[in-house]
Amino acid sequence: MTQAAEHITVLLHEAVEGLAIKPDGIYVDGTFGRGGHSRLILQQLGPNGRLIAIDRDPQAIAEAAKIQDPRFEIVHGPFSGIASYLDERGLLGKVDGFLLDLGVSSPQLDDAERGFSFMKDGPLDMRMDPTSGQSAAEWLARADVDDIAWVLKTFGEERFAKKIARAIVHDRVTEPYVRTRQLAEMIARVNPSKEKGKHAATRSFQAIRIYINSELDEIETALNGALQVLAPEGRLSVISFHSLEDRLVKHFIRKHEKGPEVPHGIPLTEAQLAGGRKLKSVGKALKPSEHEVNENSRSRSSVLRVAQRLAE
């Protein structure tokens, strides 16, 4: 395994502040990663507090094992399983805060062997959990032009999706794509787009990673799970890193702030209308400070949104 750079947790204090930690509360860190948010939450919990962390990356699980604290528990699995994990522990509707730090982490990006980065040569893997599911290389070896183009367009908003997809399918007849640099160099050759400050392969790598890990489906399932696990006044604190993630989070919060659509002409009282609302936004969407961006350029695109669970 190649040496990964030290992970700098993005919007660390802001995301945890959004949880409004109660010393004796129950909290869930849905994306343990290298434990930045979890460790800060533990610092703010009292002796009767509880923190359950989740991650599907075996390296994150190994990092979590270093935390010897009776208030802390780590679950190996996708964060989409939040409702199931909490149901098993008898904690549905009892959680005071749920935090999600979405996307790929710096250690995952910086470890060439994980296959997430087009900047370093490594096996074309891209799985958050390398022990489960198909790798990017396996999918690219089998998918047809239309499927590849759809993924690049849908999850990467790549303008030249069809051109890149055709090149992949054409080239793999003689030389399958199994290395990150091999794929990145081909995309740079066939993609005429010159986005300022962005490598030609950025959008394609993002798209393939999102597809391989079912990231948007995972997020949607986890957000719906949050409604099941959060207690009244419990907080949801979510950090997104690209427009697809943030759009999903923003629309989810807005949908449950408004409540269900009611056909025109059906008379409902204010109390009945309010009863359908499940969330309310807390503050405005927050971006990292200029200082944080200067310290950690990967934080530039991050957005934090916080919502509070309403009683039904």
From Swiss-Prot:
Protein EC: 2.1.1.199
One Pfam entry name: Methyltransf_5
Gene Ontology cellular component terms for the protein in this record: cytoplasm
Source organism, top-level taxon: Bacteria
Chain residues that bind S-adenosyl-L-methionine: 35-37, 55, 79, 101, 108
Comp. bias (Basic and acidic residues): 287-298
One GO term (biological process): rRNA base methylation
Residue segments, region Disordered: 286-306
Enzyme class: transferase
Catalyzed reactions per annotation: cytidine(1402) in 16S rRNA + S-adenosyl-L-methionine = N(4)-methylcytidine(1402) in 16S rRNA + S-adenosyl-L-homocysteine + H(+)
Keywords tagged on the record: Cytoplasm, Methyltransferase, rRNA processing, S-adenosyl-L-methionine, Transferase
GO molecular function, one term: rRNA (cytosine-N4-)-methyltransferase activity
Function statement: Specifically methylates the N4 position of cytidine in position 1402 (C1402) of 16S rRNA.
Cross-referenced PANTHER family: 12S RRNA N4-METHYLCYTIDINE METHYLTRANSFERASE (PTHR11265:SF0), S-ADENOSYL-METHYLTRANSFERASE MRAW (PTHR11265)
Family, similarity comment: Belongs to the methyltransferase superfamily. RsmH family.
Name this protein carries in UniProt: Ribosomal RNA small subunit methyltransferase H
